[in-house]
């Protein structure tokens, strides 16, 4: 298949590899993005790609807690300017309170719910769109629960660009739970611990690391041992409890949580716009479009 400049750009953003290396990888793998990433890693050219590191939309994340329930949501706008608008921020808080109180199962169900004065949630959002003048989208939300013996940790980074809610079992130390949430915001683990990683993902990583070691010219008899050592680093990158704690790198997150008498039950991390492709206008075209719109 034809390898486009956009494909090369995307692979560069995902791996940090050079343009020609990315083009070669895509050509060798017939345009398959995931296989091209593996190709670059096996050659030692790129690190593992982060699946959700492309922040391309605007908006806010927000967390609402009440008793033993917490809600995290993401509300998208088209521009950062609107995300800082008081009306948009008020809408975010209103929606969070409504969703936590009414507990819809899906975004579709949430939009169809009655809000106030006979209007639905979707109609309420549409009224805000009319006032603010920009498309606003309720992208996602999740409700988590705990018991009286547990603690929520809620953390919003950069005014809501990243939101994290954690649940610690066996302790009511909210400060500790928030510290873990801050760590999750900064390091972005995928899983709580190694047990949560699928056998398929581990085997895939083992194969990539094995090929990488062989390509480095390592003797076959020591490759297996090397791979197991590198797998340990792989787990440290993706598993929360295996990571060095950001507030005290001399201890693991597991040790920090255990020192508080708790265990991590779960976490949810939202970064605004992750995984969303934003249309990129040529600046000159954008200006012309605005001029035409004013005629």
UniProtKB/Swiss-Prot annotation:
Keywords: Cytoplasm, Elongation factor, Protein biosynthesis. Associates with the EF-Tu.GDP complex and induces the exchange of GDP to GTP. It remains bound to the aminoacyl-tRNA.EF-Tu.GTP complex up to the GTP hydrolysis stage on the ribosome. Residues 79-82 are annotated as: Involved in Mg(2+) ion dislocation from EF-Tu. It holds the Pfam family EF_TS. This is Elongation factor Ts. GO terms for cellular component: cytoplasm. It comes from Bacillus cytotoxicus (strain DSM 22905 / CIP 110041 / 391-98 / NVH 391-98). The keyword Heme does not apply. Belongs to the EF-Ts family. PROSITE patterns: EF_TS_1, EF_TS_2. GO terms for molecular function: translation elongation factor activity.
């Amino acid at each position: 298949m034809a390898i486009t400049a956009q494909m090369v750009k995307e692979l560069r953003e995902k791996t940090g590899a050079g343009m020609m290396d990315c083009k070669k990888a895509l050509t060798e793998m017939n345009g398959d993005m995931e296989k091209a990433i593996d190709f670059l890693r096996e050659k030692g050219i790129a690190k593992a790609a982060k699946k959700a590191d492309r922040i391309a939309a605007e908006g806010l994340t927000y967390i609402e807690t009440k008793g033993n329930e917490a809600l995290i949501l993401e509300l998208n706008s088209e521009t950062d300017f609107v995300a800082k608008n008081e009306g948009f921020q008020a809408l975010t808080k209103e929606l969070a309170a409504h969703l936590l109180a009414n507990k819809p199962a899906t975004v579709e169900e949430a939009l169809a719910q009655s809000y106030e004065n006979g209007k639905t949630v979707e109609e309420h959002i549409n009224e805000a769109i009319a006032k603010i003048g920009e498309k606003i989208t309720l992208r996602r939300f999740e409700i988590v629960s705990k018991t009286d013996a547990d603690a929520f940790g809620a953390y919003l980074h950069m005014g809501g660009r990243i939101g994290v809610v954690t649940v610690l079992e066996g302790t009511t130390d909210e400060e500790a739970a928030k510290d873990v949430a801050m760590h999750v915001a900064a390091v972005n683990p995928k899983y709580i611990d190694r047990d949560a990683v699928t056998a398929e993902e581990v085997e895939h990583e083992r194969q990539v690391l094995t090929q990488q070691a062989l390509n480095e010219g390592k003797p076959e008899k020591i490759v297996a041992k090397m791979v197991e050592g590198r797998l340990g680093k792989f787990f440290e990158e993706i598993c929360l409890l295996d990571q060095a704690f950001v507030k005290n790198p001399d201890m693991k997150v597991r040790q920090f949580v255990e020192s508080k008498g708790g265990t991590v039950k779960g976490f949810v991390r939202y970064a605004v716009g992750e995984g969303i492709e934003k249309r990129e206008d040529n600046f000159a075209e954008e200006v012309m479009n605005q001029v035409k719109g004013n005629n």
